[in-house]
Amino acid sequence: MKRRSVLLSGVALSGTALANDSIFFSPLKYLGAEQQRSIDASRSLLDNLIPPSLPQYDNLAGKLARRAVLTSKKLVYVWTENFGNVKGVPMARSVPLGELPNVDWLLKTAGVIVELIVNFVASLPASAAAQFERIATGLSGDLEAARQVHEALLEEAKNDPAAAGSLLLRFTELQTRVIAILTRVGLLVDDILKSASNLVTQRGQGDGLNRFRAVFGTLRLPEVADSFRDDEAFAYWRVAGPNPLLIRRVDALPANFPLGEEQFRRVMGADDSLLEAAASRRLYLLDYAELGKLAPSGAVDKLLTGTGFAYAPIALFALGKDRARLLPVAIQCGQDPATHPMFVRPAESESDLYWGWQMAKTVVQVAEENYHEMFVHLAQTHLVSEAFCLATQRTLAPSHPLHVLLAPHFEGTLFINEGAARILLPSAGFIDVMFAAPIQDTQATAGGNRLGFDFYRGMLPESLKARNVDDPLALPDYPYRDDGLLVWNAIRQWAADYVAVYYASDGDVTADVELAAWVGEVIGSGKVAGFRPITGRSQLVEVLTMVIFTASAQHAAVNFPQPSMMTYAPAICAMSAAPAPDSPSGKSEADWLKMMPPTLVALEKVNIYHLLGSVYHGRLGDYRQTGFPYAPVFSDRRVTASGGPLERFQARLKEVEATIRTRNQARRRPYEYLLPSRIPASTNI
């Protein structure tokens, strides 16, 4: 009975945990948060009368006021390294009221949760679905009506800014209405848990892959469901998928990957060779050794999902001599060649090798999801931004120009990170169910990756150089690199223009005591590896570029592929239900299907990844306050004047958008995750 109950709680739409966790559904908290935002907005109106300034140029009264504000902030924004499920990682001890999400975010997120409820209900037997369909339809209608009221209030405030104050009462009524809808969402999930538990275990009992397709009731089955076994598509994941950060060019193969010349030529043709491919910069490698305990190799038994496996494979890819497309060459399913044989991509005529090859690719995809979710997504975006958010609030006064610039890039970050720690990472939580490794090892390994992430080496240009993939002549088709650099450079120019407004010289940088305190907190309390004192304007620009890019574009690139690329379990999953293949030949489709995860894992993947990848809140370049009526953040005419830094940044983003859309017309598959119009300003989901 316990297993069945937890099974349904896993099914219940990632909204189950949300609905039953007070951090998401606490009316008093949200009302208090809006009151706090109103207070902050009032302060902002006063602050707007005086342009932001560096502390060294403030008068005595101003310096005392700054010190008082920061003293109070430090009582609210408190560091801890003992937050549950992410111990050792610097986090906020609790989420301050002003950091809770606003009505706009709640409406968007609630809409996605209801969409997931409808999807789940649609795949229940008709007799059980009827009552839930009626309630879910009503919730959808109420949410749409609330959205329309929200849009109408914003339009009124836009047309008559002076009336914004008088609209606050109606906005408060809307907020109460939205909270009531969220409460009903929670009740509906509870009802599903109570009434449908005996039906859930009957779901997805079709043959082959049918059970994985069955979890898409009303949600559109992603295109990857029909293409994931294709070798070219498998290779394209490395340059345009959710984890485009691991592939690197190599001049020679590692000693523990003994692919022979004859094997290479079987794949790439008799007129090619390993030596020639290496010399002409056409060899590319994935090595998942860094997974460590995320890849236990042996069987791991869990109550809810049975036996699971994950490995640390090595995979070789190569370009043909025409450099037209990247293709997989060979896979070794673990680090030791003595225990893991080499799998070489078979020709169409080698049918006896087909399913062994598919099994080896599944091993790679299991490693890929582990690496993506725990490292490049959670550790290197969410948890890195957490440190900069706390340091900014604790050391930069609200009147500091860098606080004004950076705060919008941290909207929602503390809140969503606490949610991740509480809901995704506990024992029997989403990650424990979906991933093979014991949850304690998963938590520790993800935390270790965050603490080991080097800030300067992680900068996009440096990361590309370190992996030898920065040259488009060597690797022509790398959408993440090409589009990412466009966005990086636009942000860098914006940071340079902004810094020039307030810092006249390098001396202004070194004389800024609040900036020095910020650096000290990032290094000391934030434990950001590689971070160091900032001694000049050019270095400050690079630092700001990295902070903003990480919170916005980098998170977008690794988060928003999830619904289209990661919800279909056979395409990618963080555990397999059977061990890696022991031989390239003699395998069947039945052997490959045994590697597919339990239906529970497939259900949880749909729910959590669709939710995380479907909420777009805020937009890069659109700097607005979090409280109604979401007024502009910047008031300094040196920043906002026509033709000034902000307008130039927004114009550059439009140019980047146009360039990417033009590129997508020529690409085999559009790469849309770094379109500026689809990049939220902060890591808020």
From Swiss-Prot:
Protein family per UniProt: Belongs to the lipoxygenase family.
PANTHER family, A to Z: LIPOXYGENASE
Biological process, per Gene Ontology: fatty acid metabolic process; lipid oxidation
Annotated signal peptide: 1-19
Pathway the protein takes part in: Lipid metabolism; fatty acid metabolism
Cofactor section: Fe cation
Main localization, broad class: periplasm
Its job: Exhibits lipoxin synthase activity as part of a bacterial evasion strategy to suppress the host immune defense. Oxygenates polyenoic fatty acids including eicosatrienoate and docosahexaenoate to the corresponding (n-6)S-hydroperoxy derivatives. In turn, this production of bioactive lipid mediators promotes bacterial persistence in host lung tissues by inhibiting the expression of major chemokines and recruitment of leukocytes.
Domain Lipoxygenase: residue ranges: 122-685
Short name of one Pfam family: Lipoxygenase
Source organism of this protein record: Pseudomonas aeruginosa (strain ATCC 15692 / DSM 22644 / CIP 104116 / JCM 14847 / LMG 12228 / 1C / PRS 101 / PAO1)
Keywords: Dioxygenase, Fatty acid metabolism, Iron, Lipid metabolism, Metal-binding, Oxidoreductase, Periplasm, Secreted, Signal
Protein name: Lipoxygenase LoxA
Annotated positions binding Fe cation: H377, H382, H555, N559, I685
Binding residues annotated for Mg(2+), in chain numbering: E133
Reaction catalysis annotation: (8Z,11Z,14Z)-eicosatrienoate + O2 = (15S)-hydroperoxy-(8Z,11Z,13E)-eicosatrienoate; (4Z,7Z,10Z,13Z,16Z,19Z)-docosahexaenoate + O2 = (17S)-hydroperoxy-(4Z,7Z,10Z,13Z,15E,19Z)-docosahexaenoate; (5Z,8Z,11Z,14Z)-eicosatetraenoate + O2 = (15S)-hydroperoxy-(5Z,8Z,11Z,13E)-eicosatetraenoate; (9Z,12Z)-octadecadienoate + O2 = (13S)-hydroperoxy-(9Z,11E)-octadecadienoate
Subcellular localization: Periplasm; Secreted
GO MF annotations, alphabetized: arachidonate 15-lipoxygenase activity; linoleate 13S-lipoxygenase activity; metal ion binding; oxidoreductase activity, acting on single donors with incorporation of molecular oxygen, incorporation of two atoms of oxygen
EC number: 1.13.11.-, 1.13.11.33
GO cellular component: extracellular region; periplasmic space
